[in-house]
Design a protein with these regions (language model features):
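RNA-binding accessory domains that recognize and position tRNA/RNA substrates
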Residues: 2-247, 262-439
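Extended catalytic-interface subdomain
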Residues: 251-253
């Protein structure tokens, strides 16, 4: 919840539907703020939320989670808010989406009518208002104290840094940890943009050998994530202890992080890797101004803040970096092959204009070799897998249909320029069933 928010809000009550974010985004697309809350919220809790104009109950016809039937509390219908049912037929609801079947246009029209005609909500949710509100809230929370931020250079942390810089200026201290799992030229670019262009207080730490040493021989994806996350915290802790007067920690949590990390009616998809787990004697109050934004809204926020296009639309990059794209136990030769293949892919996508139309694209190197032929001799080298997906909110994703000549040029370059690779494949798996990342 955005504290003291001034915008009208539609509340989505979660009955275990996997389409909660779809409904939430449909409302936000109308310029009205929406939030997902658990099905067992009380009428008192609901009324305590700011500027609620209506409720959408979202769930399937059976409403069963882990074998237990669930429903909203009866008092919700008497709380004084208009109620719409999505995904099933509720007798006490003013509007029922079930009557429209799979007619998407009719469903959108019904949601629009419910939001504006029934709930009388005002379309005042936009990034200009969001930035103004958050700058005010950050200043109220932080005052004249200092904020520490782990700056990866990705979209989320970059937008967060820009927002914090706007709110508190020189009281923001950024730490960039190069764990050796960055893309080619990534750390150098972070230093150039944030230290030299945005004039942020930036501390750069090269911890490549520390991370790769700890990851040697570790094949399990979740264990790799935990090692990377744990060591990151230790490095971050070391740098934090060198600074005096830090009271707050900036964290780039966004809404999909919250949704995918598990709620009362949702399962954990994978461990997320924002900063956490600092020791008890080094605890900070969190500053998380982006936590209610979907990914496209984070980008829109970056545009509103005046960040460069290449920064706002930088490719999404996981916290563990190439560590979850170098499958299995990480080795330096595969990591280098992966880094070079990724650079080639990004260069060719930019040349073809695909960097402006494809949401995320990257390469993966698995931990097995394939038989091939190089210089008229048998070779036994690594394959490279290309993945390119489009999505709005990272909750679902479709495969980008890349033109054959572009794929062939990428393949030719990878095979010619990386001597340890002899095969290139294209991943055709959407989300679901596959996640966007391989690990």
């Amino acid at each position: 919840m955005i504290e003291n928010m001034k915008q009208d809000m539609i509340v989505i009550l979660d009955l275990g539907s996997h389409e909660n974010t779809v409904v939430a985004r449909a409302v936000r697309a109308l310029g009205v703020y929406s939030e997902i809350h658990p099905h067992d919220i009380t009428a008192e809790e609901l009324k305590a939320l700011p500027n609620v104009k209506g409720i959408i109950i979202n769930g399937g016809p059976n409403n069963v989670v882990d074998g237990v039937a669930i429903d909203v509390l009866p008092e919700i219908y008497e709380a004084g808010f208009p109620v719409m049912a999505a995904g099933h037929d509720k007798a006490l609801c003013e509007v029922k989406l079930a009557q429209f079947g799979n007619d998407e246009e009719a469903i959108k029209a019904a949601i629009k009518s419910f939001v504006f005609d029934t709930c009388k909500a005002e379309a005042n949710w936009n990034m200009k208002n969001f930035v103004a509100d958050q700058v005010e809230l950050i200043r109220q929370q932080v005052g004249d104290k200092k904020v520490l931020l782990a700056l990866s250079g990705g979209v989320d942390s970059s937008v967060l840094a820009a927002l914090l810089l706007k709110a508190i200026g020189d009281n923001l201290y950024c730490v960039h940890v190069n764990h050796g799992l960055m893309r080619k030229g990534e750390s150098e670019n972070v230093v150039e943009v944030f230290r030299n262009q945005l004039c942020a207080n930036l501390i750069y730490v090269d911890a490549t050998d520390r991370f790769l040493g700890l990851l040697e021989g570790v094949a399990d994806p979740e264990q790799k994530r935990k090692i990377i996350g744990g060591e990151f915290i230790r490095v971050f802790e070391e740098e934090a202890r060198k600074l005096d007067g830090i009271d707050f920690l900036g964290q780039g949590t966004i809404y999909p992080d919250i949704a995918e990390s598990g709620t009362k009616t949702a399962k954990v998809v994978k461990s997320h890797h924002n900063v956490g787990g600092l020791p008890e004697d080094l605890q900070f109050e969190l500053v998380e101004p982006l936590k209610q934004l979907f990914k496209d809204e984070v980008r829109a926020c970056g545009v509103e803040l005046g960040l460069p296009h290449e920064m706002v639309y930088r490719q999404p990059f996981p916290g563990p970096g190439l560590g979850v794209r170098c499958l299995g136990a990480i080795t330096r030769d595969r990591l280098e092959a992966l880094r070079e293949a990724d650079a080639i892919l990004r260069e060719e996508f930019a040349a073809a204009g695909l960097d402006k139309t494809v949401w995320q694209y990257f390469t993966v190197v698995p931990d097995f070799k394939s038989v091939g032929v190089r210089n008229n001799e048998r070779s036994y080298d690594w394959p490279v897998i290309i993945r390119a997906v489009n999505t709005i909110d990272a909750m679902t994703a479709t495969i980008e249909q890349i033109e054959w000549p572009v794929l062939m040029k990428i393949t030719d370059r990878i095979l010619a320029e990386i001597p340890t690779v002899n095969r290139v494949c294209y991943d055709l798996s959407p989300k679901p069933n596959a996640t966007i990342e391989w690990e």
